[in-house]
From Swiss-Prot:
Interacts with TTR. Interaction with TTR prevents its loss by filtration through the kidney glomeruli. Interacts with STRA6. PROSITE patterns: LIPOCALIN. Substrate binds at Q98. Belongs to the calycin superfamily. Lipocalin family. The modification Omega-N-methylarginine is found at R121. The gene is RBP4. Retinol-binding protein that mediates retinol transport in blood plasma. Delivers retinol from the liver stores to the peripheral tissues. Transfers the bound all-trans retinol to STRA6, that then facilitates retinol transport across the cell membrane. It is found in: Secreted. Keywords: Disulfide bond, Methylation, Retinol-binding, Secreted, Transport, Vitamin A. Disulfide bonds join C4-C160, C70-C174, C120-C129. GO terms for biological process: retinol transport. This is Retinol-binding protein 4. Detected in blood plasma (at protein level). PANTHER family: RETINOL-BINDING PROTEIN 4 (PTHR11873:SF2).
């Protein structure tokens, strides 16, 4: 029987922000409740000279069911006692996008090919998660080797999210576009 209490989930040991920095392509995601980036999602993580991590992300969002825009999101990360667990404050460059302050956990990464991120926004009384989201990131938008896919699938199962992810297309929709020159 798998333990699905969020407090039991393991994260990346000795997580190294500096090695994690750079460009990551979202290959799959498990959605939370509410408006969220849909596809063509690319995140850029950076670490400043004081060791503070921040990120920008771009992706396609569908508004009002039929209006597609490329949205820019910004996030700042506050460290916690565990180097792989952050509080992420995020907001959209445009006011209609979601903003919030979520847990942002790096469940696993090899820094070179893949990363699995997890966030629980709301706990059930039994300690399991009522509203979570998770991204599988790749350094290369063409995806993973079978060996890496196996590790990623295992991590998804450990998060009690097996078969709840959908693949994210990268078809160039947002290349060179941002909401500033679409809206």
């Amino acid at each position: 029987e798998r333990d699905c209490r969020v407090s039991s989930f393991r994260v990346k040991e000795n997580f190294d922000k500096a090695r994690f920095a750079g460009t990551w392509y979202a290959m799959a995601k498990k959605d939370p409740e509410g408006l969220f980036l849909q596809d063509n999602i690319v995140a850029e993580f950076s670490v400043d000279e004081n060791g503070h991590m921040s990120a920008t992300a771009k992706g396609r969002v569908r508004l009002l069911n039929n209006w597609d825009v490329c949205a820019d999101m910004v996030g700042t990360f506050t460290d916690t006692e565990d180097p792989a667990k952050f509080k992420m404050k995020y907001w959209g460059v445009a006011s209609f996008l979601q903003k919030g302050n979520d847990d942002h956990w790096i469940i696993d990464t090899d820094y070179e090919t893949f990363a699995v991120q997890y966030s629980c926004r709301l706990l059930n009384l039994d300690g399991t998660c009522a509203d979570s989201y998770s991204f599988v990131f790749a350094r290369d938008p063409s995806g993973f080797s079978p060996e890496v896919q196996k590790i990623v699938r295992q991590r998804q199962e450990e998060l009690c999210l097996a078969r709840q992810y959908r693949l994210i297309p990268h078809n160039g929709y947002c290349d060179g576009k941002s909401e500033r020159n679409i809206l």
